[in-house]
Amino acid sequence: MLNIFSLISICLNSALYSSSFFFGKLPEAYAFLNPIVDVMPVIPVFFFLLAFVWQAAVSFR
């Protein structure tokens, strides 16, 4: 159990101190893809919401 907590703390610390990981810039050659890359993290949320819409369509069987 201690190993899990230490792994989580290591991940959180590395995520907090490497802000360039979250706010990295694409190379110049791929700059035209910036709008697509900005939207990509939201795509899994759409699939999650689609599951609820699908279940509502079949009356939550």
UniProtKB/Swiss-Prot annotation:
Subcellular location: Plastid, Chloroplast thylakoid membrane
Coiled-coil annotated residue ranges, if any: none
UniProt keyword terms in alphabetical order: Chloroplast, Membrane, Photosynthesis, Photosystem II, Plastid, Reaction center, Thylakoid, Transmembrane, Transmembrane helix
Cellular-component GO terms for this entry: chloroplast thylakoid membrane; photosystem II reaction center
UniProt keyword Chloroplast present: yes
Chain ranges passing through the membrane: 40-60
Main location: plastid
Gene Ontology biological process terms in this record: photosynthesis
Pfam family, one: PsbK
Record-linked InterPro entries: PSII_PsbK (IPR003687), PSII_PsbK_sf (IPR037270)
Pro-peptide positions on chain: 1-24
Membrane topology: Single-pass membrane protein
Transmembrane helix listed as a keyword: yes
Family annotation (PANTHER family): PHOTOSYSTEM II REACTION CENTER PROTEIN K, PTHR35325
Family membership noted in the UniProt record: Belongs to the PsbK family.
Quaternary structure note: PSII is composed of 1 copy each of membrane proteins PsbA, PsbB, PsbC, PsbD, PsbE, PsbF, PsbH, PsbI, PsbJ, PsbK, PsbL, PsbM, PsbT, PsbX, PsbY, PsbZ, Psb30/Ycf12, at least 3 peripheral proteins of the oxygen-evolving complex and a large number of cofactors. It forms dimeric complexes.
Task of the protein: One of the components of the core complex of photosystem II (PSII). PSII is a light-driven water:plastoquinone oxidoreductase that uses light energy to abstract electrons from H(2)O, generating O(2) and a proton gradient subsequently used for ATP formation. It consists of a core antenna complex that captures photons, and an electron transfer chain that converts photonic excitation into a charge separation.
Protein name stated in the entry: Photosystem II reaction center protein K
Species for this entry: Jasminum nudiflorum (Winter jasmine)
Higher taxonomy: Eukaryota, Viridiplantae, Streptophyta, Embryophyta, Tracheophyta
Gene designation: psbK
